[in-house]
Amino acid sequence: MANETGYHGHKLLEEHILKNPLLSGQVIIEVGSVREHMDGQNSTGFFMELCKKHNMKLISVDMDPECSANVHKEAEKLDFKNYEAITMKGEDYLKTIEKFDYLYLDGFDYYHNMHSQKRKDKYKEILETEITNENSWKSHLDMVKEVYKKGNDYSLLCIDDVFDANKGKGCTAIPFLMNNRWKALEHKYNAVIFSLTA
């Protein structure tokens, strides 16, 4: 689906979160914290503003300590206190939770030829691996395998950078979710959002 708005999946998740009238005390978990400040791509700051408005908490998870430091800077800029910045692989963090309200997966990058050398070097340095589609698919599949039984009646799970069945981050995670009681609600802004079926 073409994305002519400049929005990403965090906007899609917000649109569906706001359908729930009882948001106070609920938690958004994002995997993939803010890196470069590019138009439409600062999901961390976007979620902080949403959480601040509705008395929610943000947990932002990233493998890169530099990205976690960016979370603290963003919180300071927005005067936002109700958050955690966790430096950990998304798969490892999601093993530790028992339930989730709202989950945003924008982790391991898929392959394209615009990645900076710095970003490629980070993957080699921290994860001892490279940016490939197969690695991205495996990471997102591993994450959904950790959480697919941890949703509740109103839980939402959003995967960003989903272009089609063969391109983007969700190529193996999405079929797994759909075979395990999760229903795709909408594909918009190059993202797909899911809820649990009864």
Question: What is each stretch, according to the model?
Answer:
Residues 1-198:
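A short alpha-helical cap/connector motif
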